[in-house]
Design a protein with these regions (language model features):
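Glycine-rich phosphate/adenosyl-contacting loop at the front of the ribokinase-like
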Residues: 1-58, 66-71, 242-243
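Alpha-helix C-terminal capping segments
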Residues: 45-54, 98, 258-263
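Conserved phosphate-binding/catalytic region of the ribokinase-like
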Residues: 4, 167, 197-297
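Conserved N-terminal subdomain of the carbohydrate kinase-like
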Residues: 24-27, 35, 50-131, 297
Length: 297
């Protein structure tokens, strides 16, 4: 089985439902407060593990919530040999306000800002040709760049979820095999909001012209579109009653990667990822909302 190294963020999500987004200076009453282990990196690592892949988390936690975050990852079958604890800083924190089944997120990177070359070297020394490295942008971009440089030197496949969207430093895109943004991120990167199929195709072409090898854009309720080897690939969304979209994108990334690592086609992997994320949004929470492989029909 191919190893999948997720080099990324590990957060504690502090979640509260709100009837609406408060105005400046306004205090309102929320409900259903929860503490949920999260972070895009950790969520994707859990998704990989729950959906059939060999998941290895590479990241850092701090004093606050650190032990709990590691124990939670391990409980889902994620290898935590490359998760380091830092004593003098908090773990990453995400404050998530849920309004009408959608969410707004504020991050404090905390220990995620300390993911460095030493940690990456320690993890990827154990990687073999054909393994996978997955990154997001909740850790320093220099660390993403380095992880991908090491990955390509060892013959690994690299996957970038460019979230939160930010201008990419030189050296990342050219070492990215799969670039997987959502609609909002796509618009921020290339100025095209892919809210129709024609615009999604246009966005894929423009990303290819910018140097992306394989593009997969998630389109929410419209499914997802990919452009690979000069061909478009589509996957439909599955209609469900969404309750919480917090981990939908992370589920998609993890499911897609797990399936690709098994040798599946991109089309099959995208359909599998759509099925998995459609289940996630019907449940509250982040990692606990991600389905297991045996739940995907």
């Amino acid at each position: 089985m191919k190893k999948i190294f997720i080099v990324g963020s590990i957060n504690m999500d502090l979640v509260i439902d709100s009837p609406y987004m408060p105005e400046n200076g306004e205090t309102i009453t929320g409900s259903n407060f929860m503490e949920n282990p999260g972070g895009k990196g950790a969520n994707q690592a859990v998704a990989v593990s729950k959906l059939g892949g060999a998941s290895y988390m590479v990241g850092k936690v701090g004093k606050a919530f650190g032990r709990e975050l590691k124990e939670t990852l391990s409980s889902y079958g994620v290898n935590i040999d490359y998760v380091k604890e830092e004593e003098n800083i908090s773990s990453g924190i995400a404050v998530i306000v849920v309004v009408d089944h959608d969410n707004r997120i504020i991050l404090d990177k905390g220990s995620n800002a300390l993911v460095d070359k030493k940690l990456i070297d320690n993890a990827l020394k154990d990687a073999n040709e054909g393994d996978y490295v997955v990154c997001q942008l909740e850790i320093p971009q220099e660390s993403v760049k380095y992880a991908f440089e090491v990955a390509k030197s060892k013959g690994l496949t690299t996957i970038l979820n460019p979230a939160p969207a930010a201008k990419l430093i030189d050296g990342i895109l050219e070492n990215t095999d799969y670039f997987i943004p959502n609609q909002t991120e796509t618009e921020l990167y290339i100025g095209i909001l892919p809210d129709t199929i024609d615009k999604a195709k246009e966005a894929c072409i423009k990303l290819t012209e910018a140097g992306v090898k394989n593009t997969v854009i998630t389109l929410g309720t419209k499914g997802s579109i990919a452009y690979s080897n000069s061909k478009f690939v589509f996957a439909n969304a599955y209609k469900v009653e969404a309750i919480d979209t917090t981990a939908a994108g992370d589920t998609y990334i993890g499911a897609l990667t797990a399936k690709l690592s098994e040798g599946s086609s991109l089309e099959d992997a995208m359909d599998y990822a759509s099925k998995a994320s459609s289940i996630t949004v019907t449940r509250r929470g982040a990692q606990k909302s991600i389905p297991y492989k045996n739940e995907i029909k």
